[in-house]
């Protein structure tokens, strides 16, 4: 039998991720410390990502037979790095993600990161709201992969894999 609490949790994660990604309002994500597993979906679904220097990123799902995350991760790092991260479950430094352009800026502490986030938010809020909405739609439609569809497929394949492993 399928673990319904796990299935419900995965549906919720997908809904949250989709809500962030599909929001009409640009989402700025601030990362401080561990960005692991399901927590990785937040920056991967956001429009702008900031982080402190003590942050690191990890997709350890392979260690638990959870096979999701690659679609979203592709928004922060190139496809070969996605493969390495999801196949090994190893952690990656904030500097590494920054070198690929997945993080806009690295900050010494939370305070300076939040100041930058507020500066960016004020600048975006000063723009014409309807133009921002249209631009968000354009940016999302320019994605090479439909992360919403891919995430759902990853979850379905994970459930099937877990079922096969338990049989």
Named regions from a protein language model:
Residues 1-8, 12:
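Single conserved hydrophobic/aromatic residue that forms the stacking wall/gate
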Residues 7, 23-25, 45-46:
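Conserved donor-binding/catalytic loop of nucleotide-activated donor transferases
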Residues 10, 14, 37, 67, ...:
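Glycine-rich phosphate-binding loop at the start of an alpha helix
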Residues 16, 20, 30, 36-86, ...:
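CoA-thioester-processing core
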Residues 26, 43, 97, 135:
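Terminal peptide-recognition signature
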Residues 47-48, 84, 88-90, 96, ...:
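Well-ordered beta-strand positions
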Residues 50-55, 103-151:
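C-terminal long alpha-helix characteristic of the crotonase
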Residues 85-89, 135-139, 154, 158:
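Short alpha-helical scaffolding segments that buttress acidic/His motifs in well-ordered protein cores
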């Amino acid at each position: 039998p399928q673990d319904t609490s796990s299935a419900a949790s995965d549906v919720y994660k997908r809904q949250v991720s989709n809500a962030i990604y599909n929001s009409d309002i640009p989402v700025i994500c601030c990362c401080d410390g561990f960005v692991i597993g399901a927590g990785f979906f937040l920056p991967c679904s956001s429009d702008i990502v900031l982080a402190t220097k003590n942050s690191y990123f990890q997709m350890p799902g392979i260690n638990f037979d959870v096979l999701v995350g690659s679609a979203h991760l592709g928004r922060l790092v190139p496809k070969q790095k996605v493969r390495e991260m999801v196949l090994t479950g190893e952690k990656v430094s904030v500097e590494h993600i920054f070198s690929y352009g997945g993080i806009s800026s690295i900050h010494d502490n939370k305070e300076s990161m939040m100041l930058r986030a507020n500066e960016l938010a004020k600048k975006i809020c000063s723009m014409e709201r309807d133009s921002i909405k249209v631009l968000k739609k354009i940016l999302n439609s320019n994605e090479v992969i439909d992360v919403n569809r891919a995430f759902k497929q990853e979850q379905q394949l994970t459930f099937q894999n877990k079922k096969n492993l338990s049989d």
